[in-house]
Amino acid sequence: GCTKFMGSCKTDADCCEHLECYKYKWCGWDGTF
């Protein structure tokens, strides 16, 4: 599965759709809809 909002990540690929891996290593909104 994918990592949901505020979940920990290593790369953008770890995160669910419309999320990206922020520099503090959690998934946040990537600005897309």
Swiss-Prot record:
Alphabetically ordered keywords of this record: Amidation, Disulfide bond, Ion channel impairing toxin, Knottin, Neurotoxin, Secreted, Toxin, Voltage-gated sodium channel impairing toxin
Where are the Phenylalanine amide modifications? 33
The record's comment about this protein's domains reads: The presence of a 'disulfide through disulfide knot' structurally defines this protein as a knottin.
Stated name of the protein: Mu/delta-theraphotoxin-Pm2a
Q: Which Pfam families match?
A: Toxin_12
Role played: Gating-modifier toxin with very weak activity on Nav1.7/SCN9A and Nav1.8/SCN10A. Shows 22% peak current inhibition (at 10 uM) on Nav1.8/SCN10A sodium channels. Show peak current inhibition and delays fast inactivation on Nav1.7/SCN9A (EC(50)>10 uM).
Report, as the record phrases it, the tissue specificity of this protein: Expressed by the venom gland.
Q: What range does the record give for the signal peptide?
A: none
Which subcellular locations apply to this protein? Answer: Secreted
Family from the record = Belongs to the neurotoxin 10 (Hwtx-1) family. 47 subfamily.
* Top-rank lineage group of the source organism: Eukaryota
Molecular function per GO = ion channel inhibitor activity; sodium channel regulator activity; toxin activity
Q: Which cysteines are joined by disulfide bonds?
A: 2-16, 9-21, 15-27
Any one GO cellular component localisation term in the record: extracellular region
